[in-house]
Amino acid sequence: MRKANYDRFPSTKISGTVIQGWENICSLLEEHLKAYPALAVDFYTGVYEEEVINELHRLSPALFIDTRDLMKPESEIKAMTARFMTDDVLFGYVTNITLNDYFDQDKLKKAREEVIATKGKVVVVGSGAAM
């Protein structure tokens, strides 16, 4: 039998702490929010967004922002990305579009102002949360 030339079980060793369970995660976040009352949770493909959002409400923030609410309308995004799309589901074209281009700049500006003005905990979740 031929030996595979790739690692079937890849892993990366990291140092640090792993927290398991939403109660423990939220407790740790509460401690960190005492020092700096703003939390940005950026999402990546495959994250169970609704679960994370629901659980982060445990933190009882004064302001909770979901970045999906700051995006341009879907029709604008489709128009913006159309020239990079092909009929092939795997291949398209390299784009010069940035993450910032997907956001409605007026909504983004207003959200930033709300974050600055808010007294108390702020939680921003979603793709581009740290923007």
Task: Locate each region found by the language model.
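Glycine-rich P-loop/Walker A and Walker A-like loops and their local beta1-loop-alpha1 context
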Residues: 14-58
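ATP-dependent small-molecule kinase phosphotransfer cores
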Residues: 2-24, 51, 60-121
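Conserved beta-strand segments of the P-loop GTPase G domain that flank and frequently precede/overlap
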Residues: 40-42, 65, 124-125
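Short, polar loop motifs at secondary-structure junctions
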Residues: 126-130
